[in-house]
Each structure stands twice: as C-alpha cells, then as structure tokens.
C-alpha cells in the first residue's frame, strides 16, 4: 500500500494494484472483497479461519454490508459505510433473493446497526453520488460496492464473451453481489473493478451502467469507502 494522492483533475486514468481474491462459496463475495483490501498476512488469517471468524461475528452463510463494515473494523481498516437504509428495508420480504435469509438475519442486522457507533463502526445514512465515488478512486483508495448482479454488465466480458449479458448471469430480478472498485478512466467514462465470482481479471463498466447496478432496489445503495491507499498499475 502507499503512493501519492491525486485529484480528479490531475488523473484521467487510475488503476489500483490490488491482488485478486476469488470467492469460494455462493455467499462470500463480500468477504472476498474484504480480503482484497487486507494485508497479505491478514488475508491469509481470514481465509484460514473464515468459518471461525464468521461464527464469532454471528454470520451464518449470509453477509450483509454491515457485517463487512464490522470486519473492516476488526482488522483495523478505516472505512465509511453509506446506505439509504439504517437497518432492514421491510419491503425486502417480497424479494426472492432475501426470502431465505431475512427471518434468520433480521434481528441480528438491526442490532449491529444500533451498536455500530459504540463499536467504532462508521455508518452514515444517505445516497452517494457518482462524483464522490470517482473522487475516492482518484485518491487511490478502493470501494466495496453492493450491486444487482443481474445489471452488472462488464464491457470487457461482453466483448470477449458476447453470449454473456452480465458478469454474473442470473434469473431473479435481484441478485445481490459485492464487487471491489479499483479505478476509473475519466475520458472513457469507465469504472474498473474486481469481481470475486471470477478468477483473476479486471472488469470495467460504464458510469451509467454502474449507477443502474448499484442503485437497483435491493442494494440499499450500499457503499463502503475504504481509506487505505494502494499503488497504481500501468496496464490491465
């Protein structure tokens, strides 16, 4: 980690040099994103003791963004979690994606939100403009983002594998999926990200399509700003 800061006016292209981590299960995409921003020894610890740490955190094969914020705090990673809903949107009960986890997770998630401030977990209510996301990336810091995978259309994947509509094909209207934003191209209006459902590769998406995927109902527009600077890389 390291590197100098730069503003949006100074950098048209930013691409952070962050090691890729592929998820091992259907439910741990957010945990894989956490691993990507950890130091190597911390990443190894979380990987080796994943189920033990999940048990200690009260996570049972379903992670919410508040859980990721608590994990970042556990590993001493400065962060800021922004969401439009402090708690659980009651409307999620009608969403197929949440139907199997809402009952078991509802109370636990509410309690984590209520205790966040005292625990040192930074949570703010509100929406995030694309300009704020771009500014953060231009300062060489990554972002953990909740998206609707059904709308996550990678331009690179669409060109090389045109039969794929999105990076994570699925049939339900909403399929929650975490990705790690690692850069942007201001001239081409692209955001670079790592998708933990794939093996190591850098995906990219247009600004407008990213907004569509991250602001889809079901995401609560959840954004975690990670305040750790990384070196930049020259090529994809």
Question: Which residues are covered by each model-predicted region?
Answer:
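Noncatalytic regulatory segments and standalone regulatory/sensor domains
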Residues: 1-4, 136-142, 148-236
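Active-site nucleophile-adjacent alpha helix/oxyanion-hole segment immediately C-terminal to the catalytic cysteine
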Residues: 1-89, 97, 135
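Short coil/turn linker and secondary-structure boundary residues
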Residues: 45, 124-128, 205
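Alpha-helical structural motif
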Residues: 30, 64, 129, 206-209
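Generic detector of short, locally flexible boundary/turn motifs and exposed helical patches
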Residues: 2-3, 10-14, 44-47, 107-112, ...
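Predominantly the structural core of cysteine protease catalytic domains
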Residues: 68-175, 224
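Charge-rich, low-complexity amphipathic helices
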Residues: 44, 51-52, 59-60, 93-95, ...
């Amino acid at each position: 980690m390291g590197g100098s800061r730069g503003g949006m006016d100074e950098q048209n292209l930013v691409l952070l040099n962050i090691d890729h981590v592929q998820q091992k299960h259907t439910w741990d995409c957010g945990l894989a994103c956490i691993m990507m921003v950890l130091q190597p020894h911390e990443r190894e610890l979380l990987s080796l003791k994943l189920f033990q740490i999940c048990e200690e955190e009260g996570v049972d094969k379903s992670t919410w963004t508040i859980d990721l914020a608590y994990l970042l705090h556990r590993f001493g990673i400065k962060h800021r979690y922004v969401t439009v809903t402090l708690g659980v949107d009651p409307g999620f009960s009608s969403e197929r994606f949440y139907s199997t986890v809402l009952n078991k997770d509802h109370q636990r998630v509410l309690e984590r939100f209520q205790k966040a401030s005292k625990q040192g977990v930074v949570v703010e209510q509100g929406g995030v403009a694309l300009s704020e996301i771009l500014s953060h990336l231009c300062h060489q810091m990554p972002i953990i983002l909740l998206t609707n995978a059904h709308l996550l259309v990678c331009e690179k994947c669409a060109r090389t594998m045109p039969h794929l509509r999105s990076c994570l094909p699925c049939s339900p209207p909403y399929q929650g999926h975490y990705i790690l934003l690692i850069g942007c191209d201001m001239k081409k209006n692209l955001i670079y990200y790592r998708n933990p459902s794939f093996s190591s590769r850098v995906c990219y998406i247009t600004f407008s399509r990213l907004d569509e995927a991250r602001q889809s109902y079901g995401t609560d527009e959840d954004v975690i700003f990670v305040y750790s600077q990384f070196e930049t890389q020259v090529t994809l």
